[in-house]
Amino acid sequence: MKKLTALTSAVLLGLAVSSSASAQDTIALAVSTLDNPFFVTLKDGAQKKADELGYKLVVLDSQNDPAKELANIEDLTVRGAKILLINPTASEAVGNAVAIANRKHIPVITLDRGAAKGNVVSHIASDNIAGGKMAGDFIAQKLGDNAKVIQLEGIAGTSAARERGEGFKQAIDAHKFNVLASQPADFDRTKGLNVTENLLASKGDVQAIFAQNDEMALGALRAVKAANKKVLIVGFDGTDDGVKAVKSGKMAATIAQQPELIGSLGVVTADKILKGEKVEAKIPVDLKVISE
């Protein structure tokens, strides 16, 4: 009878869950993209904590596509996951995915990026507004007020891009920066390179670039080097590549997040919710400036 019960549970949960697991000990994670090392580290942090606490973690990659994200959430609810960790592709678009989970009474936790709509039990992220201001303050510390700056923005509609931009705007106002341009490069290294190439050619004397993530900053770095210019570059995330660029003197700084901790806290929070414990609606994760 016990063997029959275990087999039935496995069939209900699908191929992603082994016969030794049940729906009660399955946590699902939908990641915006696994092409970005930041989110790979976030996923690894979640996996490590899930292993430690004895949970099965099912991970799906949304490939920066809201439609794929929606399909992933539908898939995960069918698989029988009891709680969802979502790192949204975009804060507005993810509302449809959250609504699916809400209708099925599956608790949702958002990681790094928030959801503009739907019922989310807890949101775990860095203070992106504070981080954006930290980046601007660092530029002012190095170049003084009235610096000529460019901002490379992340994916439009994400809370991370909006909030980092809001924080940087506070620094712009405080230090009277001359903003030559602020354009999206979608958190992507190649787009960061291309956008920066165009702006360096059209905007002339650029003193500093704030990129809303390290991938764009590294793309900007290549463009600056190719143009044989001296420009102070500040990134955001504290990825391995970003930190290496800072320590080698190529980038001035990165505002370091803790993606592994964000993923880990997601699983810890899920564990508490599944046990019926109360959790905070917002769980902040500390930032720090890494410079040479």
From Swiss-Prot:
GO BP annotations listed: transmembrane transport
Locations listed in the record: Periplasm
Single GO molecular function: monosaccharide binding
Disulfide cysteine pairs (residue numbers): none
SUPFAM superfamilies linked: Periplasmic binding protein-like I (SSF53822)
Entry keyword set: Periplasm, Signal, Sugar transport, Transport
InterPro entries per record: Peripla_BP_I, SBP_2_dom
Domain of life, per lineage: Bacteria
Chief location: periplasm
Record's signal peptide: 1-23
GO cellular component assignments: outer membrane-bounded periplasmic space
Pfam families cross-referenced by the UniProt entry: Peripla_BP_4 (PF13407)
Similarity-based family: Belongs to the bacterial solute-binding protein 2 family.
Subunit and interaction comment: The complex is composed of an ATP-binding protein (RbsA), two transmembrane proteins (RbsC) and a solute-binding protein (RbsB).
Job of this protein: Part of the ABC transporter complex RbsABC involved in ribose import. Binds ribose.
NCBIfam families according to UniProt: PRK10653.1
Name of the protein in question: Ribose import binding protein RbsB
Species of provenance: Haemophilus influenzae (strain ATCC 51907 / DSM 11121 / KW20 / Rd)
